[in-house]
Amino acid sequence: MKKYFYLLVAILITSSCNTDDVITETLEDHYRAKTEISVAEQTIVFEYTPAPGQFINETKTGGFDGTQTTPEAAATYAAQRMKDENFVSLGGFGGYIVVGFDHSIDNSGGYDFGVKGNSFKGSSEPGIVWVMQDQNGNGLPDETWYELAGSETGKPETIQNYSVTYYRPSEPQKPVQWTDSEGNSGQIDYWKQYHRQDYYYPLWIEEDSYTLIGTCLKARNYDTSGKGTY
């Protein structure tokens, strides 16, 4: 399975619209300027919905403690992890996190914000970033989202609106099965020698299956060992 992140970031920016949109508000209606107490990092996690993965529910490296059994608890976990500058795993394809900032991020046309990721050679897992402008000023991620174009946008091998459905294992310490919108199927392997938590399927998702949708990028990392180890 192609393991790529789908990262959803709620960023308050000053200019982002479709050509068909009719904007009636003025900039001042929704622009939130920086203040002396503004910080560069995200200040709130609205939602944390990872795909299944080896670090999900994991109590050592992953930092879970078994109490993340509701969406609210999962969001609180993710917020604290990022505050402590620890990683937050998004699992397999489609996992996402929605964060907000205490000020608007100006769209200068250059690099206006950054998203940290896995920088190890052979473990590069690119993400898709979406942004949203808080036009109604209610501080919630409830308006139109826009996917930022990247180096792979528009290429034939890039699949838009790709989806993967994950299925809860019938018993502990088993792989997570998945199917996708292209007619493929597979599994997220259970690595008992490394991560022995009972389930790689998020504990706070009550349904026996859930579907994540996003943009699928061409695979760039391959199993060179022939054993699935590297």
Protein language model annotation of sequence segments:
Residues 2-8:
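Sec-dependent signal peptide recognition
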Residues 8, 138-139, 155:
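A broad, structure-centric signal for solvent-exposed, well-ordered loop/edge residues
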Residues 13-16:
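C-terminal motif of bacterial Sec signal peptides marking the signal peptidase cleavage site
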Residues 19:
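Short, conserved catalytic or interaction motifs in soluble domains
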Residues 22-125, 144, 149-230:
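A domain-level signal for the mature, folded cores of soluble proteins
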Residues 130-134:
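Predominantly extracellular/luminal cell-surface or secreted proteins
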Residues 135-144:
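Acidic, glycine-anchored loop motifs typical of Ca2+
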